């Protein structure tokens, strides 16, 4: 990382639709911190900064506590996005998707936000650079997964553009209450729901119930993991189409 970039601004004004500089590994003080080029790159950032941006910019307004790799997306000097990677909501559920997977053998893309001014292909490039960074920093990770939320009116076009495999969908219940959205887990998980769960349960009769599909995407980082996909529960399928198509 160039020493001439001491500060990072959380705005995105530069538009780069083409790769002008060959991407490469980014190091800082001898440590690998990311991958990319001057036009677009990902670098590790602090947890608090990633959470602050997600809380203010992401449509959910909520970060995931299970995230442990926080990547900023930079264009020139500007911080234009954040990707948070970590465990699934149930960390042990990875072995249900790909057999013989331990907690450090996979990652989930818990949250992703990119500035609206960035070109359309920036998301897939950021994911590509993030995967290269994961390979460098976490060589034990064999596959990654993420979910596309039907609430956004999309069926995962970003993951399709990033060459993820679609392995199925499931319907989830969401509650809308006083301008806030709650996943059904918040309602049912007494211990993990916290104050939000208590408030939702106390006001359940006022909440509006919504049901949306959640589309599961997976990207294998090696052939061995692909062969271990739990085909009793999941199978690679044609990409779904979004409601706007």
Curated annotation (Swiss-Prot):
Signal peptide: none annotated. One of its GO terms (cellular component) is host cell cytoplasm. Disulfide bonds: none annotated. The keyword Glycoprotein does not apply. Belongs to the mulikevirus mom protein family. Keywords: Host cytoplasm, Host-virus interaction, Inhibition of host innate immune response by virus, Iron, Late protein, Metal-binding, Restriction-modification system evasion by virus, Transferase, Viral immunoevasion. Fe cation binds at residues 59, 149, 159. GO terms for molecular function: metal ion binding; transferase activity. Mn(2+), Zn(2+), Mg(2+), Ca(2+), Co(2+) and Cu(2+) showed undetectable interaction. The keyword Metal-binding applies. This is Methylcarbamoylase mom. Iron-binding protein that performs methylcarbamoylation of adenine using acetyl CoA. This chemical modificaltion makes the viral DNA resistant to a variety of host type I and type II restriction enzymes by modifying approximately 15% of DNA adenine residues. The modification called momylation changes adenine for N6-methylcarbamoyl adenine and occurs just before packaging. Target sequences are 5'-(C or G)-A-(Cor G)-N-(C or T)-3'. Also usually modifies adenine residues in the host cellular DNA. Its main location: host cell. The lineage of its organism: Viruses, Duplodnaviria, Heunggongvirae, Uroviricota, Caudoviricetes. Induction: Expressed in the late phase of the viral replicative cycle. Mom gene must be expressed very efficiently only at a very late stage in the lytic cycle because its expression is lethal to the host cell. Expression of Mom requires the viral late transcription activator C and the host deoxyadenosine methylase Dam. Dam methylates three viral sites upstream of the mom promoter to prevent binding of the host translational repressor OxyR. If the viral sites are not fully methylated, the host translational repressor OxyR prevents RNAP recruitment by the transactivator C. One of its GO terms (biological process) is symbiont-mediated suppression of host innate immune response. It catalyses: a 2'-deoxyadenosine in DNA + acetyl-CoA + AH2 + NH4(+) + O2 = a N(6)-methylcarbamoyl-2'-deoxyadenosine in DNA + A + CoA + 2 H2O + H(+). Its cofactor is Fe(2+); Fe(3+). It is found in: Host cytoplasm.
